[in-house]
Amino acid sequence: LKKLGMDYKIKDGYIFAKTNGRLKGNIIKFPKISVGATENSIIAACLAKGETVLKNCAIEPEIKDLTNFLNSAGAKIRWFGRTCKILGTDSLSQTKYTVMADRIEAGTFCVAATLTKGNLEIKDFNSSIIRTELELLKKAGAKIKIDNNKIKIVGPKKIKSIKNIKTKEWPGVATDMQSQLMVLMCIADGTSSITENIFE
């Protein structure tokens, strides 16, 4: 945000930010893929003067949903792989928008069904945003059927171990699903391994 013209200071654990007038567009390359940094930079750039180019962005579904929302309000945001280009506008307008379903919540329910030998159906949900996690649950023995925007999942009688689970930026295994998968693997038959690559 400093590259967009913001001044800030950190005091007592709080960030105090200010700008003299309007933010200005710039070219920014993130040294590390970060969801929070990508989201905040996109929001700030929407009303900045000129064009902002963000490189090495996070591309989680929630970020794409955020940009769809902002575009519906008048923002000018385009994606090119992990590069995001934002042409600043003078203002945003009122809009009506339906926020996407929570993929971590859906994934957690799917793990719970696998864990408890349950029978679960999730409706009005785009399964592609948790396809990596669903593949892991299939390996664990769950029976999964995807029909349009429905997921049907039946937990196995015996849970199979999964070797070499690794969290990664989307479309990899979500770090927020790591603890749920760990619980599942605790009662699996055999030895499993999970590597946390995002927060540790």
Which residue ranges define each predicted feature?
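Short, structured segments at the rim of ligand-binding sites
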Residues: L1-E200
